[in-house]
Amino acid sequence: MNTVDIGRCSKRIVQYLWDPEPRNDEDPNSSIWCLGIEYHPDKDANTRETPDKNNTRENVMGTTNYRKPSEHAWPESFLLDFESRIWMTYRSNFPPIPRVEGDDKSASMTLGVRLRSQLVDTQGFTSDTGWGCMIRSGQSLLANALSMLVLGRDWRRGARFEEESQLLSLFADTPTAPFSVHRFVKHGAESCGKYPGEWFGPSATAKCIEALSSQCGNPTLKVYVSNDTSEVYQDKFMDIARNTSGAFQPTLILLGTRLGIDNITPVYWDGLKAALQFPQSVGIAGGRPSASHYFVGAQGSHLFYLDPHYTRPALPDRQEGELYSKEEVDTYHTRRLRRIHVRDMDPSMLIGFLIRNQEDWADWLKRIEAVKGRPIIHVLKQMNPDHDQEAGALDQVEALDDIE
């Protein structure tokens, strides 16, 4: 076992043995943001004496315990929003994803994944544990973008159950589901140089989302990918967002970027946190050394995230029109908060924005211009910018290296 594997295993062991839920004590008077919605500190949290049905906490084993109110409690409205975000995690016992033979294909796998593929999953991968975290983070980003379109930004867990179940079925762990891990791996092998059992980086994940959305044939959502730069070209975006009749269609912007070498350079901190405050935000995938997460919120210098590194049984395949059970849908949600200081994040990430209409696009452009600190996004008018436009983009962030 190499030092990277040992270090990764050590971190996971520590997390399982000591995994306290964060308290609202780092920036208790600062606003909390969750995908563009602002929540103010709950001044009355410490006066509650009667627990409500949501006054619980989830531990790492998945069990739920009563959470005693305290002066460091989180605003209830924020927790309701957080637990309504769709949370994709590792799954096991799904139909096998065929292995690709060859020494060069297994060289980039971790030791644990190689051993599992040789001793357990000999006919193919029946779990993405140990290698699918970036795919799951990307699925989370896409699922929440679709949720905002189909269910609305104000939708909360438990409402419109049938529609949520139908949305989740798009991500079922079967070869036929439009956004399954099987489809991600298939396109990754065909077009991105990523093979079963290998980590995906932000760039490969973005390209898979773009391709699978197109293959799905659903006109609900278009996808614009920045091609490993921090630049967004207005002419290219409009070509994608407008249909043949010129009408604007909801479009997901995916920006793969790297904001530093080993950590995020401090000059980018404000720009990164601001991205989660935009009403167009659908979160950030990546951003954790050797372990991708899905970031959905921020408070002060900390970011809140959903962790895909929990393995659950794959849901059984459903016939068309058949719904998941409440218990099955509940595995896609958690009330368990996790946070990280921005200085501890990995600089390689995939940032997502959902542009619903022309007015949304104009608002997003204004917000990009108003961000404090060094910009993490540059908007240019044309794919082939002239000299003046290039001069305005000299202060660009580093291009994405698709290595986790």
Curated annotation (Swiss-Prot):
Catalytic reaction list: [protein]-C-terminal L-amino acid-glycyl-phosphatidylethanolamide + H2O = [protein]-C-terminal L-amino acid-glycine + a 1,2-diacyl-sn-glycero-3-phosphoethanolamine
Keyword ATP-binding: no
Keyword Flavoprotein carried by entry: no
UniProt record, GO biological process: aggrephagy; autophagosome assembly; mitophagy; piecemeal microautophagy of the nucleus; protein processing; protein targeting to membrane; protein transport
Keywords recorded for this protein, A-Z: Autophagy, Cytoplasm, Hydrolase, Nucleus, Protease, Protein transport, Thiol protease, Transport
Catalytic residues as annotated in Swiss-Prot or TrEMBL: 133, 307, 309
Coiled coil: none
Cellular component GO terms, alphabetical: cytosol; mitochondrion; nucleus; phagophore assembly site
EC number: 3.4.22.-
Subcellular location per the Swiss-Prot or TrEMBL entry: Cytoplasm; Nucleus; Preautophagosomal structure
GO molecular function, one term: protein-phosphatidylethanolamide deconjugating activity
Pfam families per record: Peptidase_C54
Protein purpose: Cysteine protease that plays a key role in cytoplasm to vacuole transport (Cvt) and autophagy by mediating both proteolytic activation and delipidation of ATG8. Required for selective autophagic degradation of the nucleus (nucleophagy) as well as for mitophagy which contributes to regulate mitochondrial quantity and quality by eliminating the mitochondria to a basal level to fulfill cellular energy requirements and preventing excess ROS production. The protease activity is required for proteolytic activation of ATG8: cleaves the C-terminal amino acid of ATG8 to reveal a C-terminal glycine.
Family: Belongs to the peptidase C54 family.
Record protein name field: Probable cysteine protease atg4
Organism: Aspergillus niger (strain ATCC MYA-4892 / CBS 513.88 / FGSC A1513)
Gene: atg4
